[in-house]
A protein has these predicted regions:
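Acidic, low-complexity terminal tails and accessory targeting/binding regions
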Residues: 1-12, 104-118, 163-177, 190-251
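Active-site-proximal alpha-helix that buttresses catalytic centers in soluble enzyme cores
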Residues: 8-93, 97
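Active-site metal-binding loops of divalent metal-dependent hydrolases
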Residues: 19, 185, 242
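Short, active-site-adjacent cap segments at secondary-structure transitions
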Residues: 22, 79-81, 103-104, 187-189
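Phosphate-handling substructures
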Residues: 23, 88-156, 250-251
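Generic structural signal for well-ordered alpha-helical scaffold segments
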Residues: 46-60, 151, 155-167, 192
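Conserved histidine-centered catalytic loops in small-molecule metabolism enzymes
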Residues: 62-100, 122-127, 218-251
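Short beta-strand scaffold positions
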Residues: 74-75, 152, 182-183
Length: 251
Protein backbone atom coordinates (compact mmCIF):
# COMPACT_ATOMS: atom_id res chain seq x y z
CA UNK A 1 0.00 0.00 0.00
CA UNK A 2 1.45 3.38 -1.00
CA UNK A 3 1.33 6.50 1.12
CA UNK A 4 -1.62 7.98 -0.80
CA UNK A 5 -3.70 4.85 -0.18
CA UNK A 6 -2.87 4.95 3.53
CA UNK A 7 -4.35 8.45 3.74
CA UNK A 8 -7.47 7.57 1.77
CA UNK A 9 -10.71 6.78 3.59
CA UNK A 10 -13.89 5.70 1.82
CA UNK A 11 -17.55 5.92 2.82
CA UNK A 12 -20.32 4.48 0.66
CA UNK A 13 -23.45 6.57 0.22
CA UNK A 14 -26.88 5.27 -0.77
CA UNK A 15 -28.76 7.94 -2.73
CA UNK A 16 -32.51 7.46 -2.28
CA UNK A 17 -35.43 9.45 -3.63
CA UNK A 18 -38.56 9.80 -1.50
CA UNK A 19 -41.72 7.80 -2.18
CA UNK A 20 -44.49 8.99 -4.48
CA UNK A 21 -46.71 11.87 -3.40
CA UNK A 22 -50.10 13.11 -4.55
CA UNK A 23 -48.32 16.06 -6.16
CA UNK A 24 -46.09 13.61 -8.08
CA UNK A 25 -49.16 11.80 -9.35
CA UNK A 26 -50.84 15.04 -10.44
CA UNK A 27 -47.73 16.50 -12.05
CA UNK A 28 -47.56 19.46 -9.68
CA UNK A 29 -44.21 21.15 -9.07
CA UNK A 30 -43.38 20.64 -5.39
CA UNK A 31 -40.10 22.38 -4.72
CA UNK A 32 -40.03 22.90 -0.97
CA UNK A 33 -43.77 22.45 -0.41
CA UNK A 34 -44.24 19.93 2.41
CA UNK A 35 -46.36 17.34 0.61
CA UNK A 36 -47.55 13.91 1.78
CA UNK A 37 -46.91 10.38 0.54
CA UNK A 38 -49.89 8.78 -1.25
CA UNK A 39 -51.03 5.12 -1.20
CA UNK A 40 -48.74 4.14 -4.07
CA UNK A 41 -45.89 5.73 -2.16
CA UNK A 42 -46.61 3.62 0.91
CA UNK A 43 -46.22 0.48 -1.21
CA UNK A 44 -42.99 1.84 -2.68
CA UNK A 45 -41.59 2.29 0.81
CA UNK A 46 -42.28 -1.37 1.61
CA UNK A 47 -40.39 -2.39 -1.54
CA UNK A 48 -37.56 0.00 -0.68
CA UNK A 49 -37.19 -1.54 2.76
CA UNK A 50 -37.06 -5.03 1.23
CA UNK A 51 -34.40 -3.90 -1.24
CA UNK A 52 -32.28 -2.32 1.48
CA UNK A 53 -32.57 -5.53 3.50
CA UNK A 54 -31.50 -7.54 0.46
CA UNK A 55 -28.46 -5.31 -0.03
CA UNK A 56 -27.47 -5.98 3.57
CA UNK A 57 -28.05 -9.74 3.65
CA UNK A 58 -27.77 -11.23 0.16
CA UNK A 59 -24.81 -13.38 -0.84
CA UNK A 60 -25.45 -12.69 -4.54
CA UNK A 61 -22.28 -11.11 -5.94
CA UNK A 62 -24.27 -9.12 -8.53
CA UNK A 63 -26.03 -7.12 -5.83
CA UNK A 64 -24.59 -3.83 -4.58
CA UNK A 65 -24.09 -5.10 -1.05
CA UNK A 66 -23.66 -3.01 2.07
CA UNK A 67 -22.45 -4.33 5.40
CA UNK A 68 -24.65 -2.03 7.43
CA UNK A 69 -25.88 1.55 7.42
CA UNK A 70 -24.16 3.73 10.00
CA UNK A 71 -26.18 6.89 9.47
CA UNK A 72 -29.44 7.88 7.79
CA UNK A 73 -29.63 11.53 6.80
CA UNK A 74 -32.82 12.89 5.25
CA UNK A 75 -34.39 16.06 4.00
CA UNK A 76 -36.63 17.41 6.75
CA UNK A 77 -39.63 17.60 4.39
CA UNK A 78 -42.15 14.95 5.41
CA UNK A 79 -42.11 13.02 2.12
CA UNK A 80 -38.44 12.23 2.71
CA UNK A 81 -38.66 11.80 6.48
CA UNK A 82 -41.57 9.36 6.13
CA UNK A 83 -39.64 7.41 3.50
CA UNK A 84 -36.57 7.25 5.74
CA UNK A 85 -38.63 6.05 8.70
CA UNK A 86 -40.32 3.36 6.63
CA UNK A 87 -37.12 1.95 5.12
CA UNK A 88 -35.32 1.51 8.45
CA UNK A 89 -34.10 -2.00 9.20
CA UNK A 90 -32.98 -1.11 12.73
CA UNK A 91 -35.86 0.74 14.37
CA UNK A 92 -33.58 2.02 17.14
CA UNK A 93 -31.31 3.86 14.71
CA UNK A 94 -31.51 7.64 14.77
CA UNK A 95 -32.55 9.52 11.65
CA UNK A 96 -30.89 12.89 11.11
CA UNK A 97 -33.04 15.58 9.49
CA UNK A 98 -31.47 18.39 7.51
CA UNK A 99 -32.98 21.32 5.62
CA UNK A 100 -29.81 21.25 3.48
CA UNK A 101 -31.17 18.19 1.68
CA UNK A 102 -34.44 19.85 0.68
CA UNK A 103 -35.56 20.06 -2.94
CA UNK A 104 -34.58 23.18 -4.84
CA UNK A 105 -36.85 26.13 -4.07
CA UNK A 106 -38.28 27.17 -7.42
CA UNK A 107 -40.04 30.34 -6.30
CA UNK A 108 -43.43 31.14 -7.82
CA UNK A 109 -43.48 27.83 -9.72
CA UNK A 110 -44.08 25.84 -6.54
CA UNK A 111 -47.59 24.40 -6.50
CA UNK A 112 -48.09 24.97 -10.22
CA UNK A 113 -48.92 22.08 -12.58
CA UNK A 114 -45.89 21.38 -14.75
CA UNK A 115 -48.01 21.32 -17.92
CA UNK A 116 -49.42 24.81 -17.39
CA UNK A 117 -46.44 26.49 -15.70
CA UNK A 118 -44.93 27.81 -18.98
CA UNK A 119 -48.23 29.57 -19.76
CA UNK A 120 -49.08 30.78 -16.26
CA UNK A 121 -45.60 32.04 -15.40
CA UNK A 122 -43.73 32.41 -18.70
CA UNK A 123 -40.91 34.57 -17.35
CA UNK A 124 -40.40 32.45 -14.26
CA UNK A 125 -40.43 29.28 -16.36
CA UNK A 126 -37.91 30.75 -18.80
CA UNK A 127 -35.65 31.72 -15.89
CA UNK A 128 -35.95 28.23 -14.41
CA UNK A 129 -34.98 26.62 -17.74
CA UNK A 130 -32.12 29.06 -18.27
CA UNK A 131 -30.81 28.44 -14.76
CA UNK A 132 -29.94 24.86 -15.69
CA UNK A 133 -26.96 26.18 -17.64
CA UNK A 134 -26.45 29.47 -15.78
CA UNK A 135 -25.78 27.98 -12.35
CA UNK A 136 -25.85 31.27 -10.45
CA UNK A 137 -29.28 32.31 -11.77
CA UNK A 138 -31.98 32.08 -9.09
CA UNK A 139 -35.57 31.05 -9.72
CA UNK A 140 -38.06 33.92 -9.82
CA UNK A 141 -40.00 34.65 -6.64
CA UNK A 142 -39.32 34.80 -2.92
CA UNK A 143 -36.96 32.04 -1.78
CA UNK A 144 -36.02 30.96 -5.30
CA UNK A 145 -32.66 29.17 -5.45
CA UNK A 146 -29.94 28.78 -8.04
CA UNK A 147 -28.24 25.51 -8.95
CA UNK A 148 -25.16 26.68 -7.05
CA UNK A 149 -27.25 27.40 -3.94
CA UNK A 150 -28.50 23.81 -3.92
CA UNK A 151 -25.14 22.22 -4.65
CA UNK A 152 -23.46 24.19 -1.88
CA UNK A 153 -25.85 23.09 0.87
CA UNK A 154 -26.13 19.48 -0.31
CA UNK A 155 -22.38 19.07 -0.50
CA UNK A 156 -21.94 20.54 2.97
CA UNK A 157 -24.52 18.15 4.42
CA UNK A 158 -23.20 14.96 2.85
CA UNK A 159 -19.53 15.72 3.47
CA UNK A 160 -20.31 16.58 7.10
CA UNK A 161 -22.05 13.20 7.55
CA UNK A 162 -19.13 11.40 5.89
CA UNK A 163 -16.58 13.11 8.11
CA UNK A 164 -18.52 12.33 11.26
CA UNK A 165 -18.60 8.65 10.31
CA UNK A 166 -14.85 8.68 9.76
CA UNK A 167 -14.21 10.53 13.01
CA UNK A 168 -16.16 7.88 14.88
CA UNK A 169 -13.66 5.38 13.44
CA UNK A 170 -16.39 2.82 12.94
CA UNK A 171 -14.96 0.86 10.03
CA UNK A 172 -11.34 2.02 9.77
CA UNK A 173 -10.48 2.44 6.07
CA UNK A 174 -12.10 -0.76 4.87
CA UNK A 175 -14.69 0.99 2.70
CA UNK A 176 -17.52 -0.75 4.57
CA UNK A 177 -18.90 2.33 6.31
CA UNK A 178 -22.19 3.31 4.67
CA UNK A 179 -24.62 6.19 5.07
CA UNK A 180 -28.05 6.57 3.46
CA UNK A 181 -29.20 9.92 2.11
CA UNK A 182 -32.93 10.38 1.46
CA UNK A 183 -33.67 13.40 -0.69
CA UNK A 184 -35.41 14.66 -3.83
CA UNK A 185 -35.18 14.08 -7.58
CA UNK A 186 -33.98 17.60 -8.35
CA UNK A 187 -31.23 17.33 -5.75
CA UNK A 188 -30.09 13.93 -7.02
CA UNK A 189 -29.99 15.06 -10.65
CA UNK A 190 -27.95 18.15 -9.78
CA UNK A 191 -25.62 16.11 -7.59
CA UNK A 192 -25.04 13.63 -10.37
CA UNK A 193 -24.50 16.26 -13.04
CA UNK A 194 -22.13 18.55 -11.17
CA UNK A 195 -20.53 16.87 -8.16
CA UNK A 196 -19.69 13.26 -8.97
CA UNK A 197 -17.31 11.36 -11.20
CA UNK A 198 -19.14 8.60 -13.03
CA UNK A 199 -18.02 4.99 -13.16
CA UNK A 200 -21.13 3.36 -14.62
CA UNK A 201 -19.52 1.16 -17.30
CA UNK A 202 -21.75 2.44 -20.08
CA UNK A 203 -25.10 1.66 -18.48
CA UNK A 204 -28.07 3.83 -19.42
CA UNK A 205 -28.18 6.52 -16.77
CA UNK A 206 -29.84 9.67 -18.07
CA UNK A 207 -33.34 10.79 -17.19
CA UNK A 208 -35.80 11.03 -14.33
CA UNK A 209 -35.14 9.31 -11.03
CA UNK A 210 -38.17 7.29 -9.97
CA UNK A 211 -39.52 7.37 -6.45
CA UNK A 212 -37.72 5.11 -3.95
CA UNK A 213 -34.92 4.30 -6.39
CA UNK A 214 -31.45 3.66 -4.98
CA UNK A 215 -28.14 4.93 -6.32
CA UNK A 216 -24.72 4.25 -4.82
CA UNK A 217 -21.58 6.33 -4.68
CA UNK A 218 -18.27 6.38 -2.87
CA UNK A 219 -16.91 9.46 -1.15
CA UNK A 220 -13.12 9.25 -0.94
CA UNK A 221 -11.50 11.50 1.66
CA UNK A 222 -7.79 12.31 1.76
CA UNK A 223 -7.17 12.57 5.50
CA UNK A 224 -3.73 14.10 4.96
CA UNK A 225 -5.27 17.31 3.60
CA UNK A 226 -6.85 20.06 5.67
CA UNK A 227 -8.48 21.68 2.64
CA UNK A 228 -12.09 20.45 2.85
CA UNK A 229 -12.95 21.39 -0.74
CA UNK A 230 -9.95 19.65 -2.28
CA UNK A 231 -9.64 16.46 -0.27
CA UNK A 232 -12.85 14.68 -1.28
CA UNK A 233 -13.80 12.86 -4.45
CA UNK A 234 -17.32 11.64 -5.22
CA UNK A 235 -17.57 8.56 -7.46
CA UNK A 236 -20.94 7.35 -8.74
CA UNK A 237 -21.16 3.55 -8.94
CA UNK A 238 -24.85 3.01 -9.77
CA UNK A 239 -27.75 5.26 -10.56
CA UNK A 240 -31.46 5.09 -9.81
CA UNK A 241 -31.99 1.36 -9.25
CA UNK A 242 -35.46 0.12 -8.40
CA UNK A 243 -34.28 -3.17 -6.95
CA UNK A 244 -31.23 -4.70 -5.37
CA UNK A 245 -30.45 -6.79 -8.47
CA UNK A 246 -29.84 -3.59 -10.38
CA UNK A 247 -32.78 -3.16 -12.76
CA UNK A 248 -32.30 0.29 -14.29
CA UNK A 249 -34.76 2.90 -13.07
CA UNK A 250 -34.08 5.70 -15.50
CA UNK A 251 -36.48 6.93 -18.20
Amino acid sequence: MNKDDENKRVVRVLLIRHARTTHNALGIIQGQLDTEINEDGEEEIKSLRANVMKMMTSKNSSINRVKNIRKVVTSDLQRCLHTAQGMMIDASQMIEESSKLRERHVGVLQGCPRKTAPMEFPRAWATFCESKTKRGLRCAGEGGESVDDVLRRVRECIEDAVRRVLEEDLEESSGDATIAVVTHAGVLLLLREYLVDEDLSGEKNRGIVRNCSIGTMRVEVDTSSSESKSNTRWILDSWGKVDAEGTADVL
